[in-house]
């Protein structure tokens, strides 16, 4: 299948996304003819538009009115033990989207992506377990950003790579095992594109 980055931003001066929706409907028609088993996943954040446009799935994301960040990425996340966070606005937005799209496709809540701080930046191990119980049991298809399943860290202070800036800290190499290079590469560390997280606590 195909994951489409910024799928809702293709047509300028298209506030209701009519042109963008029509474009994706054409692509979906082609895909169904040539690759009928393929799936289309959009980074759009407006399921009522993306699913009509032909996508099988759409992400609720950290931008727009979803209140996704209230769950995991704010000063007081809902899944934090301090119990000061609220999921009220997220639930309202989710239910509204679900009512408009039920039967048309799937709304997906990702654990994160390459543009967000990692889950483990704001949640400890126990909080992560509860967050994943939520992510894996909600309607839709679960999407887990590589490494979130083992609690990989947001590594502060990394040198920006290709305009990644703060996002670079969420893009460190996957830690496959507890070997010196975490099973990611046989290259010397100074040759890594982005530095490995040296704390390695997610292997324990």
Task: Annotate the PLM regions.
Residues 79-103:
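Glycoside hydrolase catalytic-domain groove-lining segments
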Residues 17-21, 25, 84-91, 125-129:
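Non-membrane alpha-helical structural segments and their capping/turn regions in soluble enzymes
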Residues 15, 78-82, 122-123:
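Short, contiguous acidic/charged loop-to-helix segments that flank catalytic cores in large enzymes
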Residues 24-31, 57-80, 171-174:
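Acidic, His- and aromatic-enriched active-site or binding-groove loops in soluble protein domains
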Residues 1-50, 72, 100-103, 108, ...:
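Active-site neighborhood of glycoside hydrolase catalytic domains
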Residues 63-72, 97-103, 130-131:
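Short low-complexity stretches enriched in small and charged residues
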Residues 32-38, 46, 51-54, 89-93, ...:
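Loop/helix patches that line or flank the sugar-binding groove of alpha-linked glycan CAZymes
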